[in-house]
């Protein structure tokens, strides 16, 4: 097993030694027996016995070695974001571009289960192979991210809102990485809710440190924060899929019954929301704008 482990989870040149039905038989550099299903070949490749070709080596669920010419973005030597397919009591199952899903064990996920990733989230991982040739996903550690992020030493991104994903979630704050490689820390005081591990979120940049790491916030700028009446209207809009059958000509009685505020307060609040481009005011209704929905995406 120790010899097998050397090639599992990596890209290797293997010799084609035979064909058995629709399965090619390959030989590894240490004499490992590896199988290749024809469905895992490049369309323009014809394999010849005795020749060597480049393959990615992975184990099936029984630990038997297989090869593919469809190279994954993630190997045991490379980290990248992988899409979460589902979660269960064993952990999160991710797609790394192989014929089989890969498990990130529950022990590696946050202790608070509400912070576990959901299907469609993306985890920053590499591949880990155990002594029995079982393959798992391993989350990136802080030291790994330290060596792969893109440093920023100016204020060009200040107040910009960018998309990023948490790779580490702690009570003290959220650690995120963007597609451009920016490393962002959001202190607990700069968020109202804690994002899930791997969740795509919008974060506003508020500064940087000497190492080129960015500081971010999930809170709006002070002048964009909603007053109590505006927050009531905004929360109801979110609850009712972004549309409410009320506008500035609605009756005071209906406004009082639904929003528990006077018509004057309601008109001031929707006027403020409109000026901030959070809502549109149409005949007979108010609707959330794209910017309005983004406040939810930013955990504001």
Swiss-Prot record:
InterPro entries xref list: CvfB_fam, CvfB_S1_2nd, CvfB_S1_3rd, CvfB_S1_st, CvfB_WH, NA-bd_OB-fold, WH-like_DNA-bd_sf
Biological role stated in the UniProt entry: Contributes to the expression of virulence factors and to pathogenicity. Involved in the production of hemolysin, DNase, protease and protein A.
Name of the molecule in the record: Conserved virulence factor B
A Pfam family assignment: S1_2
Naturally occurring in which organism (per UniProt): Staphylococcus aureus (strain MSSA476)
Membership in a protein family: Belongs to the CvfB family.
Keywords: Virulence
Residue spans crossing the bilayer: none
């Amino acid at each position: 097993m120790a010899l097998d482990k050397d090639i599992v989870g990596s890209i290797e040149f293997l010799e084609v030694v035979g064909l058995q039905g629709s399965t090619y038989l390959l030989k590894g550099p240490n004499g490992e027996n590896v199988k290749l299903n024809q469905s895992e070949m490049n369309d323009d490749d014809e394999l010849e016995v005795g020749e060597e070709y480049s393959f990615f080596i992975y184990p099936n669920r029984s630990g038997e070695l297989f090869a593919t010419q469809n190279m994954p973005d993630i190997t045991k030597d490379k980290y990248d974001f992988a899409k979460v397919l589902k979660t269960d009591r064993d952990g999160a199952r991710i797609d790394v571009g192989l014929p089989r899903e890969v498990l990130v064990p529950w022990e590696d996920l946050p202790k608070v289960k509400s912070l576990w990733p959901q299907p469609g989230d993306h985890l920053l991982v590499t591949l880990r192979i155990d002594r029995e040739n079982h393959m798992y996903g391993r989350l990136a550690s802080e030291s790994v991210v330290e060596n792969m992020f893109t440093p920023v030493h100016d204020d060009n991104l200040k107040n910009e809102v960018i998309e990023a994903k948490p790779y580490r979630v702690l009570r003290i704050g959220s650690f995120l990485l963007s597609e451009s490689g920016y490393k962002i820390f959001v202190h607990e005081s700069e968020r109202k809710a804690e994002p899930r591990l791997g969740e795509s979120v919008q974060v506003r940049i508020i500064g940087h440190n000497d190492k080129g790491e960015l500081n971010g916030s999930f809170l709006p700028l002070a002048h964009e924060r909603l007053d109590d009446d505006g927050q009531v209207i905004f929360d109801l809009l979110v609850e009712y899929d972004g549309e409410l059958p009320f506008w500035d000509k609605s009756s005071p009685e209906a406004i009082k019954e639904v929003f528990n505020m006077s018509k004057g307060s309601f008109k001031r609040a929707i006027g403020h929301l409109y000026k901030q481009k959070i809502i549109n005011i149409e005949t007979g209704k108010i609707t959330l704008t794209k910017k309005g929905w983004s406040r939810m995406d930013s955990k504001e």
